[in-house]
């Protein structure tokens, strides 16, 4: 089993591996790099992987859901009618209505001819069966900067507010912001950078403990809402988590230790 504890010794919980879950994949399927995991209201586990990252995985659907018994319940993904599919998947989220959100971004794609910053500049919304519902961003266009209200820049993560159906996107590999859209219509709502300020795409100083905290995000890599009504953003390049009200008002921040040592969280 596995037991996790924080640096103060408080135990987070005990976990044991179930070697029989999930069941073996169908014949001919092979997973590439898994870049996202989510759960839905039925306790199905969803994953998204990169078929183009592993030789022999090209025919495996990028999105796969397993039921509680580990059997494949859904599988789909790739280009389709009415939407565009990027070259580098990055992240998956299942909202309060069990709609599935898929992101694209994250470094250079496996295909060296693809344009990493423009091909992977969108977020897609589907039903659990893979029916296309909504596209935010565009393919082959890319960002117009962190103040663009239309285009994304290699988004990294998605969270949907069940109360408003607004979708919060950490737009972080090329841009430096959190951007919010109407999750039903795709209309732009608002965006912000570090400390709730307007984002700045200028040079980012290298993070150091000896300097003042950076005023801007540096690769915001996750966004999530909590039961306290606040929004938490992982600012990976600056080794911190920033906390906001839903309108982007800054609340607090916490820095991650530079060296966590052995097995600490």
Which stretches of residues belong to each language-model region?
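Eukaryotic scaffold repeat domains enriched in small/polar residues
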Residues: 2-265
């Amino acid at each position: 089993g596995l037991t996790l504890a924080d640096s103060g010794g408080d135990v987070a919980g005990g976990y044991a591996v179930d070697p029989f879950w999930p069941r073996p994949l169908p014949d001919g399927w092979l997973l590439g790099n898994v870049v996202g995991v989510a759960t839905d209201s039925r306790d199905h586990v969803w994953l998204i992987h990169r078929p183009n990252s592993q030789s022999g995985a090209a025919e495996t659907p990028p999105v796969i859901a397993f039921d509680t018994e580990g059997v494949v319940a859904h599988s789909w993904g790739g280009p389709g009618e009415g939407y565009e599919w990027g070259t580098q998947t990055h992240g998956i989220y299942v909202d309060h209505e069990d709609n599935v959100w898929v992101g694209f971004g994250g470094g250079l794609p496996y295909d060296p001819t693809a344009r990493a910053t423009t091909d992977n500049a969108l977020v897609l919304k589907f039903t659990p069966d893979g029916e296309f519902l909504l596209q935010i961003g565009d393919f082959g266009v890319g960002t117009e900067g962190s103040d663009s209200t239309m285009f994304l820049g290699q988004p990294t993560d998605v969270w949907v507010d069940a109360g408003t159906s607004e979708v919060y996107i950490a737009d972080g590999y090329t841009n430096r912001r959190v951007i919010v859209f109407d999750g039903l219509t795709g209309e732009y709502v608002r965006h912000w950078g570090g400390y709730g300020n307007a984002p700045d795409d200028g040079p980012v100083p290298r993070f150091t403990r000896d300097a003042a905290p950076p005023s801007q995000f540096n690769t915001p890599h996750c966004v999530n809402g909590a039961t306290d009504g606040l929004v938490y953003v992982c600012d990976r390049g600056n080794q911190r988590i920033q906390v906001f009200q839903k309108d982007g008002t800054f609340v607090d921040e916490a820095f991650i230790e530079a060296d966590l040592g052995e097995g600490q969280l």
